[in-house]
Design a protein with these regions (language model features):
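Periodic aromatic/glycine/histidine/acidic cluster detector
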Residues: 26-32
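Negatively charged, low-complexity tracts enriched in Asp/Glu with abundant Ser/Thr
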Residues: 1-26, 106-109
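Short aromatic-glycine-(Arg/Gly/Cys) micro-motifs in beta-strand/loop hairpins
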Residues: 32-57
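N-terminal cationic amphipathic segment used for targeting or macromolecule association
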Residues: 27, 41-43, 68, 72
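Short linear sequence elements within intrinsically disordered, low-complexity coil regions
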Residues: 9-11, 23, 44-52, 86
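Mixed-charge, Lys/Arg-enriched low-complexity segments
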Residues: 3-4, 50-109
Length: 109
């Protein structure tokens, strides 16, 4: 819960845009409008096997992101994190990547 509170402190009204549990994976992506009016994103990606945790990474772009841009970047960040995990169940990892791909399709094309 601390991570979600961190986003709330920095941005107003964070919105969960993606939330899935697959096997030992639990991932969530958020977007929020920062006080300066720009859109930021954050994500939580937990893999419960040995306590591997990726905390919220709130991104700030000086040029700013559109709301849709923040959505795409959040999903890409989770995809990248999941792909780089070495010590995971490959079947669960593949399933989660498929879900992410399906979620990204309408936003990429």
């Amino acid at each position: 819960m601390y991570n979600y509170q961190f986003i709330c402190e920095v941005c107003t009204n964070p919105t969960t845009i993606f939330s899935h549990k697959v096997g030992k994976w639990d991932v969530k992506a958020y977007i929020a409008q920062s006080p300066n009016g720009k859109w930021d994103y954050g994500y939580l990606a937990y893999y419960d096997d040995g306590g591997v945790v990726c905390p919220v990474m709130l991104q700030k772009d000086d040029k700013g992101l559109s709301e849709e841009g923040a959505r795409v970047q959040a999903l890409k960040a989770i995809d990248n994190f999941v792909r780089t995990m070495q010590e995971t169940n490959k079947e669960d990892q593949s399933c989660l990547l498929d879900i992410l791909w399906e979620e990204m399709q309408p936003k990429l094309f």
